[in-house]
Amino acid sequence: MLVKNTWYVAGMATDCSRKPLARTFLNEKVVLFRTHDGHAVALEDRCCHRLAPLSLGDVEDAGIRCRYHGMVFNASGACVEIPGQEQIPPGMCVRRFPLVERHGLLWIWMGDPARANPDDIVDELWNGAPEWRTDSGYIHYQANYQLIVDNLLDFTHLAWVHPTTLGTDSAASLKPVIERDTTGTGKLTITRWYLNDDMSNLHKGVAKFEGKADRWQIYQWSPPALLRMDTGSAPTGTGAPEGRRVPEAVQFRHTSIQTPETETTSHYWFCQARNFDLDDEALTEKIYQGVVVAFEEDRTMIEAQQKILSQVPDRPMVPIAADAGLNQGRWLLDRLLKAENGGTAP
């Protein structure tokens, strides 16, 4: 089951233009476009006349015109023109989905529009902060979004799936501190400190110091599918665990966002930020490619996992102690689903 009464990312703000864009969210076909005044709109991608996709049409000043028989639908989804017919039937309309543009992202609400409150959109992102250089990307997964969330909340796989990028030997054994906040829709914070440890290859490749480091991974997950990461490495003994960040420390901020496409496919947007050498384009490309390589390592494993789950959906997974973080995440997600099915907010 998929949570509907929540804000999902529908894309980067730059994805939406005067050219119709077809996407699927939570098994629903949606068309995204901008009106003549630049306002982003999300409508059901299905003309109510003969069920042709509106995304094959054209955006005009009055709205989007279906290419099959020429009906025009405005930004609210109402039909405002039928070629050759003056009277418009009262049922000639398509569903409009609430859509908000914030932090350089498009946020869509697929559930009950009466419950869509933009104030509920996660606000603690680094996108657009002048002291951070942010670069974004997109990956399409042939896998259920929960498998991606499980992977992100699981630190121990770093040693095995990412031995040459993000992982170190200590990643497999160090236990995290897990804090669960059940106010509102909930939040999960997972913290790990690696003191006097080796840096990962990704950090080592950009660090301006050598030797051992005090490394941190602080993850904040907001259900159903948004993860903010604060990661970095500082020279050992320079006060990083107490909050001090010396100038030579390597600091990254990362946002990972998943939106279910179907039960077995997912959208994945990410924003990678750093606060050093902001104008170094060669370094930007180096870091970006390193992140992409690590994500492809994850995707290979997760998509293979989905294939097996699709073949034997009733085969149980046997939990181990290292699953504590992802199990807490699943608990919060189940809580949202139960609240939605019961018709009350958590």
From Swiss-Prot:
Molecular function terms, GO-annotated: 2 iron, 2 sulfur cluster binding; metal ion binding; toluene-sulfonate methyl-monooxygenase activity
InterPro entries: Cholesterol_7-desaturase, Rieske_2Fe-2S, Rieske_2Fe-2S_sf, VanA_C_cat
Domain Rieske: 7-108
Binding site for [2Fe-2S] cluster: C47, H49, C66, H69
Database matches in PROSITE patterns: RIESKE (PS51296)
Entry's EC annotation: 1.14.14.-
Catalytic activity: toluene-4-sulfonate + NADH + O2 + H(+) = 4-(hydroxymethyl)benzenesulfonate + NAD(+) + H2O
Keywords per UniProt: 2Fe-2S, Aromatic hydrocarbons catabolism, FAD, Flavoprotein, Iron, Iron-sulfur, Metal-binding, Monooxygenase, Oxidoreductase, Plasmid
Any Pfam family hit: VanA_C
GO biological process: catabolic process
Transmembrane segments: none
Cofactor note as given: Binds 1 [2Fe-2S] cluster per subunit.
SUPFAM superfamilies named among the record's database cross-references: Bet v1-like, ISP domain
Cofactor requirement: [2Fe-2S] cluster
Function: Involved in the toluene-4-sulfonate degradation pathway. Does not discriminate between the sulfonate and the carboxyl substituents and can also be involved in the p-toluenecarboxylate degradation pathway.
Assembly description: Homotetramer. Part of the p-toluenesulfonate methyl-monooxygenase complex TsaBM, comprising the reductase TsaB and the oxygenase TsaM.
Protein known as: Putative toluene-4-sulfonate monooxygenase system iron-sulfur subunit TsaM2
Gene this protein is translated from: tsaM2
